[in-house]
């Protein structure tokens, strides 16, 4: 396993060096290598940076995202993938690095040192971990990029990701699709309205976002986030609360096809889907009746994590299901309690 060290100053940091894992490129199969060799243009149109954040529990699902992204995206571009983490198993990293190839590079970036100054202020609940906050570090860590995509690891890419990247953000900070998890339940709609002070129809899901990194730096977004994090703790939708509050009025609303969840008023046909996002407890590795699960398993079968992922599904118990139900009920109760607070965010601070 070959490792390189990149000075943090080159990435906008002032700490010691950060380790970025970049093994030699691996061949994922003769047919795919031949396709890339013969089908991909030699002169690429540009580079598309894509960021992920994960821990050991979710890393196997990243393989599905990468597999589907590679299969469905234009090879007219180079893709640079960065996996932000705070301690991923070496064997897991090695498996993911087998997707590393010409025009499709992957680097693991440990953000542990970056996390320390704000760690005590982060609030995590049930299945959330601190990885959900990693996306706020991207603009400061990677000054070489003015624009980038961020994606959660529980996604399946069915459209050309280059099309998403080329949306014109203008002066907007973020491009995101409406959050179907919020708009499918009245208590969450009320929460966004009364606690965040936002229109739930325009509340975006942060699991697939197009980021204007140049504007983030110019507006000192990280400093604004760190300040708000110390002043108020959003406990329900957490990092998405912060992002939506801080980016309000500067969000490009993307078609929901780019972040379609299993919940929502209707189902999109395969030809209309671009990215499927298995939000909240709607996980195909836990349940066998999740909408769009066929796309998840289609790509899961092609990965080296398939046995592990299918074992999670097969070993899911009634106790796990009851735990999910209890978690859903608890979250709704928490949302209602936040709505009822006399010192809720919007009641105290008003419009950001």
Label every PLM stretch briefly.
Residues 1-35, 39-48, 54, 61-64, ...:
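A glycosyltransferase accessory/donor-loop signature
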